[in-house]
Amino acid sequence: MNSTAPTRGFNEVITGSFDRLARVYDTALVQQVFYRPPQDETIAELRRNRSRRIADIGCGTGILAARIQRELQPDQVFGVDASPGMLEQARARNPLVTWLHSTAESLPFDDGALDAIVTTTAFHFFDQRAAVTEFARVLGAGGLVVIATMHYSGPLARGIQQVTRNSFAPAHAPAPGETRELLRDAGFDVLDQRKVHRPLPNRLIPDVITLGRRR
């Protein structure tokens, strides 16, 4: 399988942390507050796009990928994650999803193999330029990318981002304009970008969802 994207050694601190947090990640409160709102928006976009070969990058314990398979029933669904602990949980969740151990910067797909890529609340952990280059490589012309990432604005949110950056470097939540620029540089037309609010208290740090179409 071909790959033109540069790669990096995936941050072992991040991977190890998510291995340890895999069971906590699945709790109802964590999912409802942090993850469910952008996942709902992502599924709605995939439904509108009628996507048939979909990969969830940074899939974690597989909740979104399993929902995509169950609710949309596309031809193929792939869940990709760099954390073995997360993937262990995911494999037990849905055997109809193909679960793959890999990083966003070096995806295990042929050129043009997919028609949609999604990533929710994980993009800040990627080498973002390398990742979107890979997204463009594995998507066919007209393929959809959906990126939902936390948007840090205001002094409290910026302080949280600084702590995250110091603890989990090279993690970085891009500003909305950065995400648009990354996609355009990689060969995407930006279709839409909007905030997705979580329940309180996490309205302080909303998600921004960005949609791109492969040129």
Regions of interest found by a model, annotated:
Residues 2-48, 63-67, 146-170:
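Conserved class I S-adenosyl-L-methionine
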Residues 55-57, 61-106:
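Class I SAM-dependent methyltransferase SAM/SAH-binding core
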Residues 105-117:
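A short acidic, Gly/Pro-enriched loop at the edge of an enzyme's catalytic core
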Residues 116-129:
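A short SAM/SAH-binding and catalytic strip from SAM-dependent methyltransferases
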Residues 129-141:
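A short glycine-rich, Lys/Arg-flanked "PGG" loop and its adjoining helix->strand segment in the class I
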Residues 171-187:
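Short alpha-helix
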Residues 188-199:
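Conserved S-adenosyl-L-methionine
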